[in-house]
Amino acid sequence: MEHYISLFVKSVFIENMALAFFLGMCTFIAISKKVETAIGLGIAVVVVQAITVPANNLLYAYLLKEGALAWAGLPDIDLSFLGFLSYIGVIAAIVQILEMLLDKYVPSLYNALGIYLPLITVNCAIMAGSLFMVERDYNFPESVVYGIGSGFSWALAIALLAGIREKLKYSDVPEGLQGLGIAFITIGLMSLGFMSFSGIQL
């Protein structure tokens, strides 16, 4: 149990998708203007990561990995070259289902997210979750914990940035730095803050 808690903490703070690896920056900056919308997208990312990382783990372990098809009497077949295509297919399917559910049950959030909801499909943070899982050779329970943790790390970062950007609206920001300029500086300072977690050994 301690191993899984360590993995979760590590994925949220030490290896934060947005502030340590700078993944998913396009959506991260575009949707972080309002806290409510940022939290909505953050929850969507957590849900997508929590489903796609374990799903891709099963896909890799029982279909794509070298020797994975031994159960079908094909031990010499290696389909790992289909990894990228397969992971994107799984991610696209999950995002499409999530989009339909939000459209039906939470139309206000669906409209607020707009084009950025289908763009989760090509959000590199989502893809990175599956690629890191394969690279680090996580088993299924580890991939579940890592999927939730990596999604939560991105959601936490965008919610924090949105809160800061809302406060900055009432601040006396120099004209040349208003908008994206101060947002990039804020992200850099947040990243420096999260670097302090890198000294923690888990």
UniProtKB/Swiss-Prot annotation:
Classification via Pfam families: Rnf-Nqr (PF02508)
Which reaction equations make up its catalytic activity?
a ubiquinone + n Na(+)(in) + NADH + H(+) = a ubiquinol + n Na(+)(out) + NAD(+)
Q: Where in the cell is it found?
A: Cell inner membrane
Which branch of life, at top level? Bacteria
Keyword Translocase listed? The answer is yes
Q: Which residues form a coiled coil?
A: none
Q: Name one GO molecular function term.
A: oxidoreductase activity, acting on NAD(P)H, quinone or similar compound as acceptor
Membrane topology is: Multi-pass membrane protein
Q: Main site of residence?
A: membrane
Q: Where are the transmembrane segments?
A: 11-31, 35-55, 81-101, 114-134, 144-164, 180-200
**What keywords are annotated for this sequence in UniProt?**
Cell inner membrane, Cell membrane, Ion transport, Membrane, NAD, Sodium, Sodium transport, Translocase, Transmembrane, Transmembrane helix, Transport, Ubiquinone
Q: Its function?
A: NQR complex catalyzes the reduction of ubiquinone-1 to ubiquinol by two successive reactions, coupled with the transport of Na(+) ions from the cytoplasm to the periplasm. NqrA to NqrE are probably involved in the second step, the conversion of ubisemiquinone to ubiquinol.
NCBIfam families per UniProt: nqrE
Q: Which family does it belong to?
A: Belongs to the NqrDE/RnfAE family.
Under the heading HAMAP family, the entry gives:
NqrE
Oligomeric and partner information: Composed of six subunits; NqrA, NqrB, NqrC, NqrD, NqrE and NqrF.
Protein name per Swiss-Prot or TrEMBL: Na(+)-translocating NADH-quinone reductase subunit E
Gene name, Swiss-Prot/TrEMBL: nqrE
